[in-house]
Amino acid sequence: MIGWLHGQIIDKHQPGKLVLDVNGVGYDVETSLNTFFQIENGNQPVGLHIHTIVREDALLLYGFLDKEERSLFRSLIKVNGVGPKLAMTVLSSISPKEFIQCIHQENAALLTKLPGIGKKTAERLVVEMRDSIKQFDGSVSDTFQKQAGSTHSQQEAISALEALGYKPQEAWKVMNKIDNGNKSCEQLIREALQILSSR
């Protein structure tokens, strides 16, 4: 199993997906938006903690800058009814620290505001992750509280919303309601998701 990859980003155009060149071999890697927007554009080397899923027709690689985020991903996919895609959506819609707080506080209502999470799934997450979440107490660093190094455009934020399943028109409409200012793409996405979930 692949647990770590270190190389250069050669393709980073679609939010949540990138190609990592490791010694001349290009690996397709899926990431959470938290990780994706912390990786700066360019040819600088980057290391990713990898979770590998082997299927009959595919080898799927999920990459994380932070080892704790990978551990949280692994805990999520152990929950009945939560697959890798939904786990990535959760980690893209809320910071690991905020998610852990929801579980500690048994705040299933807030979890239902995340894309793809219904009432039953939210309650299942709270019940099944109460014990496993203890390993993260104090371990999820401020990495995910930091903004990405550079300001990203509204277009990138809209592309990310589309990747999460929202229609382009809907994404544009909600983005126009947000004061762009000097906010990072990640901040724009968070605010957009808050608006969309409050409807």
From Swiss-Prot:
A single BP term in Gene Ontology: DNA repair
Domain II: annotated segments: 66-144
Positions of region (Domain I): 1-65
Subcellular location: Cytoplasm
Cellular component GO terms held in the UniProt record: cytoplasm; Holliday junction helicase complex; Holliday junction resolvase complex
GO molecular function, one term: four-way junction DNA binding
Sequence segments annotated as region (Domain III): 149-199
Stretches for region Flexible linker: 144-148
Keyword DNA-binding: yes
Matching InterPro entries: DNA_helicase_Holl-junc_RuvA_I, Hlx-hairpin-Hlx_DNA-bd_motif, NA-bd_OB-fold, RuvA, RuvA_2-like, RuvA_C, RuvA_C_sf
Keywords: Cytoplasm, DNA damage, DNA recombination, DNA repair, DNA-binding
Any one Pfam family match given in the protein's UniProt record, by short name: RuvA_C
Subunit structure of this chain's protein: Homotetramer. Forms an RuvA(8)-RuvB(12)-Holliday junction (HJ) complex. HJ DNA is sandwiched between 2 RuvA tetramers; dsDNA enters through RuvA and exits via RuvB. An RuvB hexamer assembles on each DNA strand where it exits the tetramer. Each RuvB hexamer is contacted by two RuvA subunits (via domain III) on 2 adjacent RuvB subunits; this complex drives branch migration. In the full resolvosome a probable DNA-RuvA(4)-RuvB(12)-RuvC(2) complex forms which resolves the HJ.
Domain comment in the entry: Has three domains with a flexible linker between the domains II and III and assumes an 'L' shape. Domain III is highly mobile and contacts RuvB.
Family matches, as HAMAP family: DNA_HJ_migration_RuvA (MF_00031)
Entry function: The RuvA-RuvB-RuvC complex processes Holliday junction (HJ) DNA during genetic recombination and DNA repair, while the RuvA-RuvB complex plays an important role in the rescue of blocked DNA replication forks via replication fork reversal (RFR). RuvA specifically binds to HJ cruciform DNA, conferring on it an open structure. The RuvB hexamer acts as an ATP-dependent pump, pulling dsDNA into and through the RuvAB complex. HJ branch migration allows RuvC to scan DNA until it finds its consensus sequence, where it cleaves and resolves the cruciform DNA.
Family of this protein: Belongs to the RuvA family.
Protein name according to UniProt: Holliday junction branch migration complex subunit RuvA
